[in-house]
Amino acid sequence: MYSRIIGTGSYLPEKVLTNQDLESMVDTSDEWIRTRTGIERRHIAAEGQMASDLALEASRNAIEAADIQAKDIDLIIVATTTPDMIFPSTACILQNKLGMSNGPAFDVQAVCSGFIYALATADMFVSSGKARNALVVGAEVYSRIMDWNDRSTCVLFGDGAGAVILTRDQKPGILSSHLHADGSYSQVLTAPASIHSGKIQGTPFITMEGGTVFKFAVKVLEEAALEALQANQLQPSDIDWLIPHQANIRIITSTAKKLGIPEEKVVATVSQHGNTSAASVPLALDQAVRDGRIQPDQHIVLEGVGGGFTWGSVLVRW
């Protein structure tokens, strides 16, 4: 028995922050941002709009696409680095907003690899018979943990959510998943704040060593894709679509080049929403499904890399 994706959905907040807007906020330019990242705009959550609110809209779209009802879902996994609160989980909050009270609901935190981790986890539940219909969501409000005076990071990130519905099926859907982590890199990309006696200790904002992140990301994204292909006796030429984490265009194109995958087989949406962390892969997937690029029986590699470092891949037959 397999798990199969039967519906996708996404949501981006209404407010758009362009590169031109950022020119008036920090010492940067539209040309500098586009040349180095490929990003043209990013979406920013409204005041009071939480990760669960973004997740709710993406989930509704995925549920509609799957032609099921919320009550049919018996597992919710939300990947987020920016939860609504310390606890309860954003997944539990989302479950309530969907009008549900059945089945487990929990969060996964693997930063930009979060959706890959969550999808792999849901696949294990569904393919083993522990769940029938799973809702898997990546949702982020990175604007809340951004230092808007730091031009090295504030130009990169945006808010958004993407979701998929997994169901049990005899026909192959998710073929394999591959997850990894190396905590020795934990200080390279981090938001290191912690709470002690009600007070925040350390900076709550994102800090990163950009050069180290770039080199590591390209290396492990190539390895993760090859691992998935080798596990299924496939070659890079057998990939119909590569959907990597939408960090920046240089990482995306460098990964594809190392794999020998032509640009026309790569789904890249980073220009329209920036790095949305755990939301980026399902956002890109949903766009490619809705615009008709993804067709039945195609092979798709979904992959991500994030702080930790964490990384992984999922190979899908659509």
UniProtKB/Swiss-Prot annotation:
Origin species: Nitrosomonas europaea (strain ATCC 19718 / CIP 103999 / KCTC 2705 / NBRC 14298)
GO molecular function (one): 3-oxoacyl-[acyl-carrier-protein] synthase activity
Keywords of the record: Acyltransferase, Cytoplasm, Fatty acid biosynthesis, Fatty acid metabolism, Lipid biosynthesis, Lipid metabolism, Multifunctional enzyme, Transferase
Pfam families: ACP_syn_III, ACP_syn_III_C
Role this protein plays: Catalyzes the condensation reaction of fatty acid synthesis by the addition to an acyl acceptor of two carbons from malonyl-ACP. Catalyzes the first condensation reaction which initiates fatty acid synthesis and may therefore play a role in governing the total rate of fatty acid production. Possesses both acetoacetyl-ACP synthase and acetyl transacylase activities. Its substrate specificity determines the biosynthesis of branched-chain and/or straight-chain of fatty acids.
Quaternary structure (record): Homodimer.
GO CC term, one of those recorded: cytoplasm
Gene Ontology annotations of biological process type: fatty acid biosynthetic process
PANTHER family, per database record: 3-OXOACYL-[ACYL-CARRIER-PROTEIN] SYNTHASE, BETA-KETOACYL-[ACYL-CARRIER-PROTEIN] SYNTHASE III, CHLOROPLASTIC
Protein name, entry field: Beta-ketoacyl-[acyl-carrier-protein] synthase III
